[in-house]
Amino acid sequence: MPNMEPTTKEIKEQKIYQEMGLTDSEYELVCSILGREPNYTETGLFSVMWSEHCSYKNSKPVLRKFPTEGKQVLQGPGEGAGIVDIGDGLGVAFKVESHNHPSYVEPYQGAATGVGGIIRDVFSMGARPIAMLNSLRFGELDTPHAKYLVSEVVAGIAGYGNSIGIPTVGGEIQFDPCYTKNPLVNAMCVGLIEAKDIQKGQAKGIGNPVMYVGAKTGRDGIHGATFASVEFSEEGEQQRSAVQVGDPFMEKLLLEACLDVIRDHSDILVGIQDMGAAGLVSSSSEMASKAGAGLELIMDDVPQRELNMTPYEMLLSESQERMLLCVKKGHVEEIQALFERYGLEAVVIGQVTDDKMYKIIHHGEVVANVPVDALAEDAPVYHKPSKEPARYQAFQEEKAFVPAMDDVVGVWKELLAQPTIASKRHIYEQYDYQVRTDTAVVPGSDAAIVRVRGTEKAIAMTTDCNSRYLYLDPEVGGAIAVAEAARNIVCSGGKPLAITDGLNFGNPEKPEIFWEIEKAADGISAACLELDTPVISGNVSLYNETDGTGIYPTPVIGMVGLVEDLAHITTQDFKNSGDVIFLIGETKAEYSGSELQKLQQGKISGRAPELDLATEKKYQQLLLTAIQEGLVASSHDLAEGGFGVALAEATFKAGLGADVEVPFALNQLFSESQSRFLVSVKPENEAAFAQLMELEKVYRLGVVTEDDTIRVKHKEDQVTAKTTELRSIWEGAIPCLLK
């Protein structure tokens, strides 16, 4: 028999609503909206829909700062994913989503279902997913638990992505102590769509049926959205019931069936949405609210895989591989027949109404009846207090860190062995990045590139964020995250189009944390405006704290760019001996927040590196022009580890060397100054490249050599290192640490 649910009186007097995630004032607001005390099911509906994860009640004032419009934008924020125009009637849909809390509790399933959820967001728009990326954060690889988390998260991503047949083509991983108990797992999906096929998540047309398709509903993931909206604790590790279990083979069937409906039955499909966070209640109430309609759902008709499920459990379950469709009256059988061909259930569970109410019926009784807008649109919005942390001013005034560089080659080797810098081949080789056979640039270069079939175009894509810079200065660091993403796209031959942002922060109820969120948004907005990359989708993950210890501010930037001609595709590795090496951009003694500072001081402090957005834009445009004119053989942005690491990485693939003279002192070899690019050009293109770059801070450094030796000179100083030795250290670091 099902458990007896608390009465309205018990909910109020025992403050059961607090356990469900509502504050006292929010509970009172619900009572005011309803004109009565909510029952248990209704309290559950409000608790999940008013969670930060679903309502963005703490972050909405900040999100409004983002530029979201541009001539390239076909769909901005507010739907399952954003979409940009790439010409020829085609669009690219993409979005990033976090699955942080679940991935700490149950790393394999947490990561796997994060992948599944973001794939559904993209195909719910009518787009065929063509690529996956991820952005991961872990603690140092010096404990068995850290190694376990990395191995299981990567296995979960691989297990789901490989099984469903979507290539995982790129991403980034950073290791820092602040992520030890707060790992971040952000998954990004990119899809291709014909502009005419764009769908909306809406339920309109009075009397139109609402259909449930896909897997049956179980008790997994109940209150998952609430779980993701509170600070974590050691006890929270026991909350495995809030973590869903995924089935990629079911998802593959669901994907193909939904795309068939969109392609062949668009005239009878009114709307479609994934059942993601907060499950059925979220998808159904949002679809009705967006259309200005109401909804009546019959819980008895919801496919269930467990006995005696209550309406509360069915509405809040986050069981995976489920979609909600609204179709025109009289066409249910057509839709059911299509889904049956894929072996999937498609069941009518309700209909659109005209009263703007959200009515739930079970065993012939009304068990919930609330205004639909109150759930989906009218959550309270909080303008949290904001306060500059004491550390910020201290960092501004701190004496600049000066690295110990007595043994330059020794430092070089140490840096290449740091897991944040070291080769991630051991990780990405677990992913099938060639499935679908359209991957033009595989993991390991600045950006991944996937061809657009039937055209000469390709899509460049990347995820980026150096959270250490944001810890020092969230505004500058936020701008750098966008700039670096754009750099990676440009270095690969693409024109940056737009971003999706995964905003991972600590507890917003702490004024110092909310200050970080505000400032990071300011930096991201400024860079997006300057570089013409509007924010078209995203995700907010707050409360990434465990027992009071939080993460660095980590707004992950997922960016997509257009490679207009396959001939423009460029990679970071040197191609031929004799090619001429150039450095674009100025190198300064900037080590704060750098991999070198972390290595030598064991901590991060000081002023973040400077970023001039006008200079950044100018250099990116010049480099992209040079690439499009066929003048560039290789191109690599300078990021973690600065020039020294970028130069070494450029030699590794072909086993070449380099003989260069740099315009800065050798103790600045690992400075992380911004807006810099390492470029090689064929000798016959040198004059044209130099002319294009005339009057800019562009330096001819030397040439690519046939031997496996890197020689770096500045005036009388010189260092020499063997490519093979550096590569061995770089490639072996992570496999060694994960043993």
Swiss-Prot record:
Top-rank EC class of the record's enzyme: ligase
Top-level taxon in the UniProt lineage: Bacteria
Alphabetized InterPro entries for the sequence: PRibForGlyAmidine_synth_PurL, PurL_linker, PurM-like_C_dom, PurM-like_C_sf, PurM-like_N, PurM-like_N_sf
Binding annotation for substrate: 98-101, 120, 244, 318-320, 541
Annotated pathway: Purine metabolism; IMP biosynthesis via de novo pathway; 5-amino-1-(5-phospho-D-ribosyl)imidazole from N(2)-formyl-N(1)-(5-phospho-D-ribosyl)glycinamide: step 1/2
Annotated Gene Ontology cellular component terms: cytoplasm
Name of this protein: Phosphoribosylformylglycinamidine synthase subunit PurL
Species the sequence originates in: Listeria monocytogenes serotype 4a (strain HCC23)
